[in-house]
Design a protein with these regions (language model features):
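Hydrophobic h-region of N-terminal signal peptides that target proteins for export
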Residues: 9-16
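Intrinsically disordered and other compositionally biased segments
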Residues: 8-9, 137
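Surface-exposed acidic/polar loop and edge beta-strand patches at domain peripheries
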Residues: 17-130, 138-345
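Positively charged n-region of N-terminal signal peptides that target proteins for export
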Residues: 1-4
């Protein structure tokens, strides 16, 4: 049985196939070996934030903005023995392109162990993209699962000057001991290392604490990564009813920033399901989702790249205008408008 499982999880193709959308203002590309967003850049400033990838030779491996599903983090010991991979199967299997027309595309993947299917629809509009993912439980039984977006930025976009901002609020360090890791509680952008405050907006040569999770109290969550010298902002917007958690991962190599995860999802506790189900909630937010037999659940987010008119030290707020736009305001008072692709949500 285990041999069969390993065959099912093996890459179906050795050469990566990429699905690319290009509207003349921006281009965005998805690697069908694993389904990750691996390239997003403006035509007049060709800098791709999504250069990070895990080491290895497998065609389907973690890279760029990948999806974690049916879990975030490690399986249980029994699941590991059954062949369940870290962060779930969805970024370890081949995706199949369903269609592509102009600036829209559809792709799909099946998770043979989890018995889940996912269909992703991407619509590129200006320098933003709307991504909708519909998850279907193919089993005759309901089950708990998790779905965490794992955008991971890397050099050369990522360096010591990049600033991360968000409307996240209460949080906790994943390194805090169970069963109550939410104590001590911190508030974005603060974290604690050995009892001393750490500002997670910046990353220089010390990644600790390397994973800190926060909840968002507003109707919509947002997170941005701003490069001051390049005047370039990468950002995400999502509905917190769908993704209540923001998880910040930081990684350094050779004393330099190497990866920053801007991870939003259905859970904020990096533990196997036996622990998640016992814990249940933190800060009143659930640590897992439930999908019934044959049910389909959809979630969506907006990703954008914008160039600022002048250098800035960070994004102070992102607000919805009600007239089809988001307004990004810098700490210096600059305003940049982004089309609201989540309108009506």
């Amino acid at each position: 049985m285990r041999a069969t499982i390993l065959v099912l999880l093996a890459p179906l193709a050795l050469l990566a196939e990429t699905l690319t959308l290009d509207n003349g203002s921006a281009k965005i590309a998805w690697d069908l070996s694993g389904g990750a967003l691996v390239d997003f850049q403006l035509k007049d400033q060709p800098i791709n934030p999504f250069t990070w990838q895990e080491q290895g030779t497998a065609a389907a491996r973690l890279r760029g903005h990948f999806l974690c599903m049916d879990r975030w983090g490690a399986p249980s010991a029994a699941e590991i023995s059954a062949g369940v991979p870290f962060h779930g199967e969805v970024s370890r299997v081949e995706w199949r392109q369903l269609g592509k027309s102009g600036t829209e595309a559809e792709m799909t993947a099946r998770l043979p162990l989890a018995r889940l299917g996912v269909k992703r629809t991407v619509k590129l509009d200006g320098t933003s993209a709307l991504v909708t993912e519909a998850v279907t439980n193919e089993a005759p039984l309901g089950r708990v699962y998790n779905m965490v977006q794992h955008p991971t930025i890397g050099p050369p976009f990522l360096d010591e000057t990049v600033v991360v901002d968000s409307n996240a609020r209460q949080g906790f360090m994943q390194s805090s001991p169970m069963p109550n890791p939410e104590h001590p509680t911190v508030v974005w952008p603060q974290a604690l290392k050995d009892g001393m405050p750490v500002n997670l907006r910046m990353l220089k040569d010390d990644p600790l604490p390397n994973v800190v999770s926060y909840v968002v109290d507003d109707e919509f969550g947002w997170v941005t990564a701003l490069h001051p010298d390049k005047r370039l902002v990468l950002g995400y917007l999502w509905k917190t009813a769908e993704y209540p958690w923001l998880n910040i991962w930081r990684h350094v190599e050779a004393g330099k920033p190497f990866a920053r995860g801007l991870e939003f999802g259905t859970t904020g506790l990096h533990q196997p399901y036996p622990i998640l189900t016992r814990k249940g909630r933190i800060f009143g937010r659930s640590l897992f989702a439930f999908i019934d037999a044959t049910e389909t659940q959809s979630r969506r987010y907006q990703v954008f790249l914008v160039k600022l008119p002048a250098t800035a030290s960070g994004i102070s707020q992102v607000r919805r205008t009600g007239s089809g736009e988001w307004v990004l305001e810098t700490r210096e008072g600059q305003q940049v408008r982004v089309k609201d692709l989540l309108a009506g949500q």
